[in-house]
Amino acid sequence: MEYEAVIGLEVHVQLNTKTKAFCSCPNTFGAPANTLTCPRCQAHPGTLPIVNKEMVHKTIKAGLATNCTIQKKSRFARKHYFYPDLPSYYQITQMDEPICTEGHLDITVLNDDGSSYNKSIRINRIHMEEDAGKLVHDDTGRPLSYVDLNRAGCCLIECVSEPDISTGEEAYQYLTELKKIFKYIDVSDCNMEEGSLRCDANVSIRPKGSTELGTKTEVKNMNSFRNVRLAIDYEIKRQIKALNNGEKILQETRLYDAKENTTKGMRSKEGAADYRYFPDPDIPLLVLKDEEIEQAKKELPELPQQKRERLKKDYDLPDQDIVVLTEDAALADYYESAVKAYPKQPKKISNWIMVEVNAYLNKKLQTIKDFKPKAEHIAEIFKLIDEGVISGKIAKEIFEDMCETGEAPSAIVEKKGIKQVSDTGELETIIRKVLEENPKSVADFKAGKEKSFGFLVGQTMKATKGQGNPKLVNEVLRKILSE
């Protein structure tokens, strides 16, 4: 029997608010354990939650950017469960009345043969909730864990997709696009290493063409988008194999083991009834005004898909260039600033940013915001090349200095005296001397041995210390040899 997978993703995103969701404790990463807490974070009796206005505002932006309907009335609820890093033994979240509903995200998926297809993934809801604390397990082998409540109470949104995803690759592309959007609108840094973005996958299979859903498993412990893809693909194969062997699929939570590329059963999967949801009596109904939603709309920047379409239209760049440049909104802005400064070479500027600039940033573990050279300086490189002032080789040499000092290319060329030799008379003098010193190569060339011409070009470039204009060197050399 042929099966198809039905996959839904639950993506938790920590918002980059100044303070936590329901108290005034700072929302920062990396502080010493239990230094960013208060009686409310620690669930002391009698402490009351106060809804963070910035959290609400950023959630509205996230909903609008993912084509959701913003509900003017929404309600917080309590989700009850026992875990050491949850001191109140319940989490403040939203259940029946979330703030964002009925959205969608469009993705493009590449096939193995190089073709691609577009797909729209529906978003069931985006709701607000508070984060739990963190357990730090003893690394000496003792059966001991420490509780760090710095993260407890931090602002989270949970983005729940409909089960419209069919493969690990589709999940990967969905997460990639979602991350881009949330970074573009500045609601989160989406750093998986710091726990700012976490993803769980609900995976089930059913006979192809069937409309009934199979028994689902929830897969956790995936710390990269690549691992999400691998875990889902493994779980699909595992479930198909189990059904073909006459086994039943258990509704359970499974953990992904990246070393073995397998999923392993952890516990039976809870249902909503197990959490005993009910409206939080300490938080009134959240009522939004039209102007609050309109303000969030006004703050939305050009989103990734819009930017991709515009770059294609304005600069006629290849798709691969557009994908790389729009990975980061700041990088795309940097590119456009460079092209505006020198509109003649949009493709060459794109190549330079993708290769030279990105290589430097990756080496230094920096972002484009940390990059010293201005966009106009990248543009000036190509202006100098087109004017014959420098060669491509010299451009790479001065680029290293630009990265260290932030100086303009023209200033570095002037300071180091490495301007390209483009004076025909000067080149002719140098070339005639080279020919005098290499009579055998001259004779070989005139005897039809074209390779000797390359040797003479090399000797000329050596004589100019690499600063000869390559095009002029070739032209003048051929002219003199033909005399």
Swiss-Prot record:
Molecular function GO labels: asparaginyl-tRNA synthase (glutamine-hydrolyzing) activity; ATP binding; glutaminyl-tRNA synthase (glutamine-hydrolyzing) activity
SUPFAM superfamilies: GatB/YqeY motif, Glutamine synthetase/guanido kinase
Record keyword Hydrolase present: no
EC annotation from Swiss-Prot or TrEMBL: 6.3.5.-
Top-tier EC class: ligase
Catalytic activity: L-glutamyl-tRNA(Gln) + L-glutamine + ATP + H2O = L-glutaminyl-tRNA(Gln) + L-glutamate + ADP + phosphate + H(+); L-aspartyl-tRNA(Asn) + L-glutamine + ATP + H2O = L-asparaginyl-tRNA(Asn) + L-glutamate + ADP + phosphate + 2 H(+)
PANTHER family: GLUTAMYL-TRNA GLN AMIDOTRANSFERASE SUBUNIT B MITOCHONDRIAL AND PROKARYOTIC PET112-RELATED, GLUTAMYL-TRNA(GLN) AMIDOTRANSFERASE SUBUNIT B, MITOCHONDRIAL
Top-rank taxon: Bacteria
Keywords (A to Z) from UniProt: ATP-binding, Ligase, Nucleotide-binding, Protein biosynthesis
Protein name (record): Aspartyl/glutamyl-tRNA(Asn/Gln) amidotransferase subunit B
Similarity section: Belongs to the GatB/GatE family. GatB subfamily.
NCBIfam families given in the database record: gatB, PRK05477.1-2, PRK05477.1-4
One BP term from GO: glutaminyl-tRNAGln biosynthesis via transamidation
Origin species: Brachyspira hyodysenteriae (strain ATCC 49526 / WA1)
Record carries keyword Lipid metabolism: no
Subunit relationships: Heterotrimer of A, B and C subunits.
Purpose of the protein: Allows the formation of correctly charged Asn-tRNA(Asn) or Gln-tRNA(Gln) through the transamidation of misacylated Asp-tRNA(Asn) or Glu-tRNA(Gln) in organisms which lack either or both of asparaginyl-tRNA or glutaminyl-tRNA synthetases. The reaction takes place in the presence of glutamine and ATP through an activated phospho-Asp-tRNA(Asn) or phospho-Glu-tRNA(Gln).
